């Protein structure tokens, strides 16, 4: 069987997040920053990763991960050699920025802000944060920014989706 790339959730769309981002960049204010953060913590992202072992595909086309499958997330580094996990906002952005090494297949895994918190805020994490669309919008969310966001989340919950309170990572 030929090796193939897996792109999970090709319909993932973060239109509202991108609008909030563009608004924040065009008219920076506490309100536009808050709107962006609120959308970011409720969004799902596509993150490049290598899966070991490679998943099998069922007759129905479903992917089957073996117990103990290891997920190695791809990262980018800045000039100071700090590593940042990658958060693409949609399949189009992920596809145009494929990150494959010789002999390896890079898949795309759905992640959330909470997933990034669990990975990055771990005391032994090699990551300094994550970057949203690193080859276009290039919005860097550092460990320190994540800690500030999380402190504020604990103080207040911001409604999203017509006033319904949702936990970060529950989707748009």
Regions found by a protein language model. Give the residues of each.
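An interfacial alpha-helical scaffold signature
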Residues: 1-172
């Amino acid at each position: 069987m030929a090796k193939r790339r897996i792109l999970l959730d090709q319909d993932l769309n973060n239109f509202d997040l991108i609008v909030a981002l563009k608004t924040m960049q065009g008219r920076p204010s506490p309100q536009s920053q808050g709107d962006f953060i609120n959308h970011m913590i409720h969004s799902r992202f596509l993150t490049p990763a290598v899966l070991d072992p490679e998943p099998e595909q069922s007759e129905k086309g479903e992917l089957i991960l073996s117990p103990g499958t290891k997920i190695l997330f791809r990262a980018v580094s800045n000039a100071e050699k700090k590593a940042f996990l990658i958060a693409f906002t949609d399949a189009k952005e992920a596809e145009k920025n494929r990150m494959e090494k010789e002999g390896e297949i890079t898949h795309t895994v759905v992640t959330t802000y909470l997933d990034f918190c669990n990975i990055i805020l771990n005391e032994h994490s090699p990551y300094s944060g994550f970057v949203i669309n690193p080859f276009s919008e290039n919005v860097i969310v550092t460990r320190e920014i994540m800690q500030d966001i999380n402190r504020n989340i604990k103080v207040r919950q911001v409604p999203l989706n017509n006033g319904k309170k949702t936990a970060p990572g529950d989707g748009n």
